[in-house]
Amino acid sequence: VPHRLPQDEFGRMVEAVNALLQALKEAKERERAFLAEASHELRTPLTVLLGHLDRLGRNPQDLEALRTARATAERMRRLVEDLLALARGEVERNLNLHIVDLGEVAREAALEHGVAAEAESGEVLGDPDRLLQLLRNLVANAVRAAGKEGVRVRVRREADHALLEVEDSGPGIPEDLLPRLFQRFARGPGGGTGLGLAIAHAIAKAHGGEIAVESRPGRTVFRVRLPLLEEEA
């Protein structure tokens, strides 16, 4: 909206509208990039899955093809779950609360991805499935950035909180991306759909916790703090 007005109330209003239009344009561009990436993320494993299923059709005893097909199907299932969780707003609602040892959850996620873990026990009140989803998203993001050997998962007790850290030795996150890293469709240098970190942020908030990131070339650390149960504090 072009204007040549003095800095009065109307002029400031026009500037605010322009800022809003720019924000909407950027959001639309992120959405288009996400749709393209999500289509690619689904199409690629589908091609792999169909290929291995074809191999199984010719040789039902091919266990390697079966393992790969199962792993690929699981990857697709998680992506679809992420999409549905955000679309329905389910991340913040309908938590199935239990006493959860965050250290156990961290070790499970680390084992799934083949990365190192140093996890103390720390009991929190939370949804075990959502907390595992949070861990999986952070660890998968780190593995994309640095490979399995460059990732460390840690859990320790810190005053009245459990502190979870996922560290990688990848190239780091561009400084201009950091302020919007946990927004939907914000994609880091490692690629991906831009959903994982937004979901991790929503899960942490839903559990009364917080998530933050510190990054420089060669070292990125995501930190999640969750309230410990009173008897653990």
Model-found features: residue ranges?
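Short conserved segment of the HATPase_c
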Residues: I173-F185
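Membrane-proximal coiled-coil signaling linkers
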Residues: L24-R75
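Short alpha-helical Gxxx[C/S/T] motif in the catalytic ATP-binding
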Residues: G196, A200
